[in-house]
């Protein structure tokens, strides 16, 4: 599209055809493959920069449906390697705010709302066929001159007739080795107080208040856990 010296730049639009009875037209853009020693071609989608206002946005959306079917799926997938290399990475990173007083951009992953059940959010580490499976790490941001960020894991309140969601922390089971450990620890302090650990059960207005149960593991071949 054309540049605009004193106004807006020109619009570039690529649209597949609509259909009244059949499937709408498809739109495909593919970078070139390489059958030799070179890398396959890259595909880049960039929104426009702005020197005086906000940069342009990039929106990728799947289609809606009104006829009882599922909405279109959106899949982001990195490439597979079959010749000794690692699989491709997928990185989702929000923008940095470099000027004084500005914040970094937020990254939000939200499952869809449903008239019956809400959608799930699932995060899995990769399976390791010959070695350890992939790790899942949730790390808050560091503060270079002030406090680091917090991590909050919480289920929301229930409606009038429901039960609030449960929180389950569990390590894995093993058939031939030791099962995974579960550790909860607060941070050390060099010049101040060490962090506290608080375990609190809920009050009960009508029924019994919540209990705390700590049970050591059983063993069939040696002493039970302490």
Task: For each feature predicted by the language model, list its residue ranges.
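Surface-exposed, glycine- and small/polar-enriched segments that build interaction surfaces at terminal
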Residues: 1-226
């Amino acid at each position: 599209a054309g540049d605009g010296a004193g106004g807006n730049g020109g619009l570039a639009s690529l649209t597949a055809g609509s259909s009244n009875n059949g499937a709408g037209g498809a739109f495909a853009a593919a970078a070139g493959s390489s059958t030799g020693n070179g890398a396959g071609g890259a595909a880049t989608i960039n929104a426009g920069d702005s020197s005086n206002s906000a940069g342009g946005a990039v929106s990728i959306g799947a289609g809606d449906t009104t006829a009882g079917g599922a909405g279109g799926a959106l899949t982001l997938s990195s490439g597979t390697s079959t010749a000794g290399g690692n699989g491709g990475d997928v990185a989702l990173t929000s923008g940095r705010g470099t000027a004084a007083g500005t914040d970094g951009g937020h990254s939000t992953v939200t499952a869809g709302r449903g008239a019956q059940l809400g959608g799930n959010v699932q995060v899995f580490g990769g399976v390791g066929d010959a070695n350890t499976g992939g790790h899942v790490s949730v790390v808050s941001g560091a503060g270079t001159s002030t406090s680091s960020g917090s991590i909050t894991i919480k289920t929301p309140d229930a409606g009038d007739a429901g039960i609030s969601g449960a929180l389950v922390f569990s390590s894995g089971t093993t058939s031939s080795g030791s099962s995974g450990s579960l550790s909860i620890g607060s941070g050390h302090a060099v010049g101040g107080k060490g962090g506290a650990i608080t375990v609190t059960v809920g009050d009960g207005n009508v029924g019994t208040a919540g209990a705390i149960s700590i049970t050591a593991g059983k063993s069939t071949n040696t002493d039970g856990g302490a």
